[in-house]
Amino acid sequence: MSKIIGITMGDPCGVGPEITVRSLAEMSAADREATRIYGNLATLEAAREALGLSVDLQPYVVDLTVEGAPLPWGSLSAVAGDAAFRFIERAVRDAEAGNIGCIVTAPINKEALNMAGHHYDGHTGMLRSLTGSSAAYMLLASERLKVIHVSTHVSLKEAIGRATTERVLATIRAGNAHLKRIGYEHPRIAVAGINPHCGENGLFGTEDDDQIGPAVAAAREEGIDVQGPISADTVFHRAYSGGFDLVVAQYHDQGHIPIKLVAFDTAVNVSVDLPIDRTSVDHGTAFDIAGKGIANHGNLNSAIAYARKLVAGQASRKAAS
């Protein structure tokens, strides 16, 4: 299995190119040799100039054509959306072929993506489609808090409908397997409720009793150390304080808000249950500051470090088999 990680530079008009260049510039020579950047060389060179850096880019870039590159920073366009898709598509194919061990994605713009005819709700849905996977889960990881989501980019109304026993159970299983993979021998998992105070015995909704509770019971029967549903207004604090290794959140904002509160610049977005490995920054394209050389690349550094751990784990498993 390849130890090379592949960074997709994201939307050419956003902060992705500059944070990618800055992260590459800070790498050791050995880490650079184990890195490929899927993007557009002219755009990356423009970002390098904006940053005032002198790092050599050409040896590490899989250079893909972008019409009119470099495009204006901070602009929304179908050209940029299509380019962002093609960067990811090429990286996925190389990952499937074993040429790279993990993909690290810089931010894309969903509106630009859809303008270009690529109708996905984000990276996770796109990767699920490109790999032909039936399921994929978004896990946000920080040093003291990790959260996996039952649903993500859907309306709150739809998210409630998606919190089925089957889907909650599948999310618990996926989270448990991932934590074991990264070194947790006996992961301790908490499942957040979806209603205030988990419905108060049906006073505020029955989903916790009828859908989420049975999923937790089934997971426990499988030997998974899981508790819940636990009221969402306390479960994240308990996990952050060391009581749990992972929280299963029922919908996007339930899981994202606590993570971004405690680890805004360092949290890593991980796609779980795909046939390939992928980590990502946990922020958007930030068009308002793109090209100004002020974007914080700490989040990307965290995603790169997590990817290298996953790649090292692949090598360890292969050696043991």
From Swiss-Prot:
One GO MF term attached to the UniProt entry: oxidoreductase activity
Coiled-coil segments on the chain, per record: none
Necessary cofactors: a divalent metal cation
Gene3D superfamilies in alphabetical order: Isopropylmalate Dehydrogenase (3.40.718.10)
Sequence positions that bind substrate: 123-124, 260, 269, 278
InterPro entries per record: PdxA_fam
Keywords, comma-separated and alphabetical: Carbohydrate metabolism, Metal-binding, NAD, Oxidoreductase, Plasmid
Pfam families recorded: PdxA (PF04166)
Residues noted as binding a divalent metal cation in the record, renumbered to the chain: 153, 197, 252
Family matches, as PANTHER family: 4-HYDROXYTHREONINE-4-PHOSPHATE DEHYDROGENASE (PTHR30004), D-THREONATE 4-PHOSPHATE DEHYDROGENASE (PTHR30004:SF6)
Role noted for this protein: Catalyzes the NAD-dependent oxidation and subsequent decarboxylation of D-threonate 4-phosphate to produce dihydroxyacetone phosphate (DHAP).
Self-association state and partner proteins as the record states: Homodimer.
NCBIfam families per record: pdxA
Family that this chain belongs to: Belongs to the PdxA family. PdxA2 subfamily.
Protein name in UniProt: Putative D-threonate 4-phosphate dehydrogenase
Protein's organism: Rhizobium meliloti (strain 1021)
